[in-house]
């Protein structure tokens, strides 16, 4: 049973998260690779990693982790912040990158020496756990609506994501022009 104090803490956390997302989302897109606040929820890494931080359309990611963030941003833009599969796909992408780093014997590094993968990856991974938690709460209050059929087209050349499950949609992707894919995104 959820007590009044626990419920108010959850409500406060959700409010703070949403407020931070709204305030941060009013910023301009990034076309520069940056590394700030590497070990906090206020992280900004590459062009695409961080709450409310996003790259300008057509901007290539700074490294493989930034490519995972770019793919996540594209999914959230289309499906909404409460679509949990976007967050789960991001975690799979980061897990795959982590395994690749371990097998590279230290040769695979991110673009920033100030924010090495050893600090950035756990930070964004833990932040995504919060995203999954708050998405679940958001879906209680605002369940997805069936109906519209948006289509996404993304160049996945650098993202290294697993597209077998349709980026979390369970729909097949149509490949065209090399690494460009498109899919109908039914909820």
Curated annotation (Swiss-Prot):
Q: Could you provide one GO biological process annotation from this protein's UniProt record?
A: arachidonate secretion
Active-site residues (renumbered)? 72
Q: Coiled-coil ranges per the record?
A: none
Q: Which GO terms of the cellular component aspect does the record hold?
A: endoplasmic reticulum; extracellular region; Golgi apparatus
* Gene Ontology molecular-function annotations: metal ion binding; phospholipase A2 activity
Catalytic reaction(s) noted: a 1,2-diacyl-sn-glycero-3-phosphocholine + H2O = a 1-acyl-sn-glycero-3-phosphocholine + a fatty acid + H(+)
| UniProtKB keywords | Calcium, Disulfide bond, Endoplasmic reticulum, Golgi apparatus, Hydrolase, Lipid degradation, Lipid metabolism, Metal-binding, Secreted, Signal
Q: Which CDD domains match?
A: PLA2_plant
Compartmental location: Secreted; Golgi apparatus, trans-Golgi network; Endoplasmic reticulum
Give the cofactor binding note: Binds 1 Ca(2+) ion per subunit.
Signal peptide location: 1-25
Names of required cofactors:
Ca(2+)
Q: Which cysteines are joined by disulfide bonds?
A: 29-56, 33-62, 38-115, 49-69, 68-93, 75-86
* UniProt-listed Enzyme Commission number(s): 3.1.1.4
Where does the UniProt entry say this protein principally localizes? secreted
The EC category is hydrolase
The record ties this protein, via SUPFAM superfamilies, to: Phospholipase A2, PLA2 (SSF48619)
InterPro entries under this entry? PLipase_A2_dom_sf, PLipase_A2_His_AS
Tissue expression pattern: Strongly expressed in mature flowers but weakly expressed in other tissues. Detected in buds, open flowers and in pollen.
- Sites binding Ca(2+) sit at 48, 50, 53, 73
Q: Which family does it belong to?
A: Belongs to the phospholipase A2 family.
Q: What else is known?
A: The enzyme has a slight preference for phosphatidylethanolamine over phosphatidylcholine.
Write out the function statement from the record: PA2 catalyzes the calcium-dependent hydrolysis of the 2-acyl groups in 3-sn-phosphoglycerides. Releases lysophospholipids (LPLs) and free fatty acids (FFAs) from membrane phospholipids in response to hormones and other external stimuli. Plays a role in pollen development and germination and tube growth.
What is the protein's given name?
Phospholipase A2-gamma
Originating species: Arabidopsis thaliana (Mouse-ear cress)
Q: Organism classification, top ranks?
A: Eukaryota, Viridiplantae, Streptophyta, Embryophyta, Tracheophyta
Gene name, per UniProt, is PLA2-GAMMA
């Amino acid at each position: 049973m959820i007590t009044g104090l626990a419920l108010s803490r959850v409500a406060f956390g959700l409010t703070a998260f949403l407020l931070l997302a709204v305030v941060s989302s009013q910023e301009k897109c990034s076309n520069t690779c940056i590394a700030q606040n590497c070990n906090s929820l206020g992280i900004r890494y590459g062009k695409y990693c961080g709450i409310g931080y996003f790259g300008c359309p057509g901007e290539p990611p700074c490294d493989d982790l930034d490519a995972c963030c770019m793919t996540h941003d594209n999914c959230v833009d289309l499906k909404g912040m409460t679509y949990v599969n976007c967050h789960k796909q991001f975690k799979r992408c980061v897990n795959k990158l982590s395994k690749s780093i371990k097998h590279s014997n230290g040769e695979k590094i991110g673009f920033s020496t100030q924010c090495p993968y050893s600090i950035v990856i756990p930070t964004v991974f833990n932040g995504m756990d919060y995203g999954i938690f708050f998405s679940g709460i958001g879906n209680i209050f605002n369940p997805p609506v069936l109906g519209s059929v948006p289509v996404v087209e993304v160049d996945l050349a650098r993202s290294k994501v697993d597209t077998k499950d349709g980026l979390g949609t369970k729909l097949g992707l149509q490949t065209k022009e090399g690494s460009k894919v498109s899919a109908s995104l039914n909820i």
